[in-house]
Amino acid sequence: MKTIQIAIDGPASSGKSTVAKIIAKDFGFTYLDTGAMYRAATYMALKNQLGVEEVEALLALLDQHPISFGRSETGDQLVFVGDVDITHPIRENEVTNHVSAIAAIPQVREKLVSLQQEIAQQGGIVMDGRDIGTVVLPQAELKIFLVASVDERAERRYKENIAKGIETDLETLKKEIAARDYKDSHRETSPLKQAEDAVYLDTTGLNIQEVVEKIKAEAEKRM
């Protein structure tokens, strides 16, 4: 079985990361959560009170405190800036609400895309984000564009937040997700869009395992 690159793109809370992790584990591939990298950059900007116009200061911070990944004893992904574990802080609402603005900064995207491409050279990889199939891995053997209704995505995020002990209002989440969809698909740099050769998959009404099986079937055709 040959190793391939699998790119999974889609809007916020469409289930990309959950599905990508399972597929990577099943195939023995590396999983890279690119969204966590943009969240880490956003966390750094907020922590240091940097506005979107203070690009040089943010890039300098990212050089001083590089983003890296690790594994917990239970196999869960950990995210670090420098040697500080920021796995949980990057999932807080303040980061979620600002990440689109930071991710739209061309120099930040350029820096992180370069790092993502470097990691992808290591072999079989599953990467999820907004522009993986169009910008980061345009040569990926399998590209998936994952979507779901705003209501369903808000429900998923609501349940995730409750499980993590994060206080959340469902109606607010719906508005935030719709607003983020607009920002992500209308930004000038690497907007969210489906690659021409991507497989379109609407996950509304499907459970995680059903989505995983559909993507694995597509992957196996290419191996």
Swiss-Prot record:
First and last residue of the signal peptide: none
Annotated InterPro entries: Cytidylate_kin, Cytidylate_kinase_dom, P-loop_NTPase
Gene3D superfamilies associated with the record: P-loop containing nucleotide triphosphate hydrolases
SUPFAM superfamilies: P-loop containing nucleoside triphosphate hydrolases
Keyword Disulfide bond: no
GO biological process: nucleobase-containing small molecule interconversion; pyrimidine nucleotide metabolic process
Keywords: ATP-binding, Cytoplasm, Kinase, Nucleotide-binding, Transferase
Organism superkingdom: Bacteria
UniProt EC number: 2.7.4.25
Record-level Gene Ontology MF annotations: ATP binding; CMP kinase activity; dCMP kinase activity
Keyword flag ATP-binding: yes
Residues given in the record as ATP binding sites: G10, P11, A12, S13, S14, G15, K16, S17, T18
One matching Pfam family: Cytidylate_kin
Main location: cytoplasm
UniProt catalytic activity: CMP + ATP = CDP + ADP; dCMP + ATP = dCDP + ADP
GO cellular component, as recorded: cytosol
Localization terms from the record: Cytoplasm
Matching PANTHER family: CYTIDYLATE KINASE, CYTIDYLATE KINASE/PANTOATE-BETA-ALANINE LIGASE
Family label: Belongs to the cytidylate kinase family. Type 1 subfamily.
The protein, known as: Cytidylate kinase
Organism: Streptococcus pneumoniae serotype 4 (strain ATCC BAA-334 / TIGR4)
